[in-house]
A protein has these predicted regions:
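A short N-terminal helical cap/helix-turn-helix that marks the beginning
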Residues: 89, 123-132
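AMP-binding/adenylate-forming catalytic core of the ANL superfamily
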Residues: 2-87, 100, 105
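Hydrophobic/anchoring residues in structured secondary elements
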Residues: 27, 93-96
Length: 132
């Protein structure tokens, strides 16, 4: 991370994962101007939330991540989490990933640890959206 101040991605990731809306998150931004995050929603929870709220949103992963209501709700979760961190550690932008991260999908190791390089590769278009 460019500035002298170093950030510890796992601290921010764990804080974000306290949200019921967020299943997985990977903080990115090494050698970039700001920290950002790739977020995999808790799709089941989000679908229930959509029903509770009566939003007219298809319960497909793609429709959920594309919806303004879901994007805004996740922004609130990120904003709340950011309050716990210094300015330089705060997540400035995020992208929602369309599929659950899994061992089979190559996102996770058999012990459920994130394969950061694989996730970066899979979602490189999303990373480009963030930093361009």
């Amino acid at each position: 991370y460019k500035r002298q101040k170093y950030i510890i991605p796992t601290l921010i990731e764990n804080a974000l994962k306290e949200s019921n809306f967020i299943e997985q998150v990977m903080v990115i931004g090494e050698n970039q101007k700001m920290p950002a995050a790739l977020i995999q929603l808790n799709f089941e929870f989000v679908a229930e939330w959509i029903s509770r709220k009566g939003f007219n949103i298809d319960k497909t992963n793609h429709s959920m991540i594309a919806s303004r209501e879901v994007q805004e709700r996740i922004q609130q979760e990120v904003d709340n989490c950011n309050l716990r961190f210094g300015k330089w550690e705060q997540i400035k932008k995020f992208e929602l990933t369309p599929d659950p991260w899994s061992i089979d999908g190559g996102h996770l190791t058999p012990t459920m640890k994130m394969k950061r390089s694989v996730i970066l590769k899979i979602y490189s278009p999303l990373v480009e959206n963030i930093y361009n």
